[in-house]
From Swiss-Prot:
Species the sequence originates in: Chlamydia caviae (strain ATCC VR-813 / DSM 19441 / 03DC25 / GPIC) (Chlamydophila caviae)
Entry annotated with the keyword Metal-binding: no
Lineage, uppermost ranks: Bacteria, Pseudomonadati, Chlamydiota, Chlamydiia, Chlamydiales
Protein name: Probable disulfide formation protein
Cited PANTHER family: DISULFIDE FORMATION PROTEIN-RELATED, SPBETA PROPHAGE-DERIVED DISULFIDE BOND FORMATION PROTEIN B
GO cellular component, one term: plasma membrane
Location within or outside the cell: Cell inner membrane
GO MF annotations, alphabetized: protein-disulfide reductase activity
Length: 136
């Protein structure tokens, strides 16, 4: 199982990233839900990863983690910060625009958008790290 995951880590990372990109566009343009500022920052990290990981998967380039891991970790840090804004009372942020960064919007009825984002970025990061290992 681990060998299968290691051999296909880039593909799974790209699949998670592409799913997140499609879901983000679906929420914005089809459901007309305006994202907050922190969501835009997470998108800045997520959208390029779809292209970068897609090319790396096609070329079987495991060295892509040098470029993709910083984007993934940055997105995860922003998502965790937004989770803290939502869950810790008294935490505020001054950069929020018309949409509050602390507003909870649930995906599938039980997980918030930043929590789904943090999980996706965490999974992408783990898969990128795993893709470079050469253990037999």
């Amino acid at each position: 199982m681990i060998r299968f995951l290691r051999n296909n880590a880039l593909y799974f990372a790209w699949l998670i990233c592409s799913t997140g990109t499609v879901m983000s566009i679906y929420y914005s343009y089809l459901l007309n839900i305006e994202p907050c500022v922190l969501c835009y920052y997470q998108r800045i990290c997520l959208f390029p990863l779809s292209i970068i990981l897609g090319i790396a998967t096609y070329r079987e380039d495991n060295l892509v983690k040098i470029y993709a891991l910083p984007l993934s970790i940055t997105g995860m840090v922003i998502a965790v910060y937004q989770i803290c804004l939502q869950e810790i009372s008294g935490m505020t942020i001054d950069i929020c625009g018309r949409v509050s960064c602390s507003t909870k919007l649930f995906v599938f009825g039980f997980i918030t958008v930043p929590m789904a984002s943090a999980l996706a970025f965490c999974a992408i990061s783990c898969l990128l790290i795993l893709s470079g290992s050469k253990k037999k």
